C-alpha cells in the first residue's frame, strides 16, 4: 500500500506542478533515496516531502519520531541543497512535509500552483509540516 500511496501522491503533485523539476520523485544519491523534492516556481521555498501511508497521523498531533528524523535528515543533506540550487550557508533549513491519507478531508488535494498552502505545523519541530489527503473510494453497489 505504501508504494501505491506514493504513486497516488506523485500523480496529484504532477497534475498541479507541471514545470520542469518542480516535482522530483525518488531522488537518489549515495544510497539515500527520498520520496519527493518539491520546488514550485511560484512558491517562496522548496520542500522535502515524504508520503507516509499512516492514517493515524490525522488522528493525533504529531508524527512518528523515526519518520521525522528520516525527512529531517534528507532536508539537511548537502546534495539536496545543490539539487534545489540553494546555498546551504545562506538560507534557512529546507522545509519538511509529510503527506498522509486522511478520509476526513473535504477535498482530495488542495495544493495550488500559485500559493503555498498553510500546512499543519508539527509541534516540537522547526519548519516541519504535515497534510492529509483524501483517497478515492469505490462505492459499493451492495447495501
Residues covered by each model-derived region:
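Catalytic core segments in nucleotide and nucleic-acid processing enzymes
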Residues: 1-143
Amino acid at each position: 500500500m505504501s508504494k501505491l500511496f506514493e504513486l497516488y501522491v506523485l500523480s496529484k503533485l504532477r497534475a498541479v506542478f507541471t514545470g520542469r523539476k518542480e516535482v522530483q520523485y525518488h531522488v537518489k544519491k549515495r544510497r539515500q533515496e527520498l520520496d519527493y523534492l518539491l520546488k514550485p516556481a511560484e512558491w517562496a521555498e522548496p520542500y522535502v516531502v515524504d508520503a507516509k501511508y499512516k492514517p493515524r497521523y490525522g488522528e493525533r498531533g504529531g508524527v512518528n519520531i523515526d519518520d521525522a528524523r528520516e525527512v529531517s535528515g534528507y532536508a539537511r543533506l548537502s546534495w539536496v541543497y545543490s539539487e534545489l540550487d540553494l546555498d546551504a550557508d545562506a538560507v534557512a533549513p529546507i522545509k519538511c512535509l509529510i503527506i498522509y491519507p486522511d478520509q476526513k478531508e473535504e477535498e482530495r488535494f488542495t495544493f495550488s500552483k500559485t500559493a503555498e498552502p498553510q500546512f499543519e505545523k508539527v509541534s516540537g519541530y522547526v519548519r516541519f509540516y504535515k497534510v492529509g489527503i483524501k483517497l478515492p473510494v469505490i462505492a459499493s453497489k451492495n447495501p
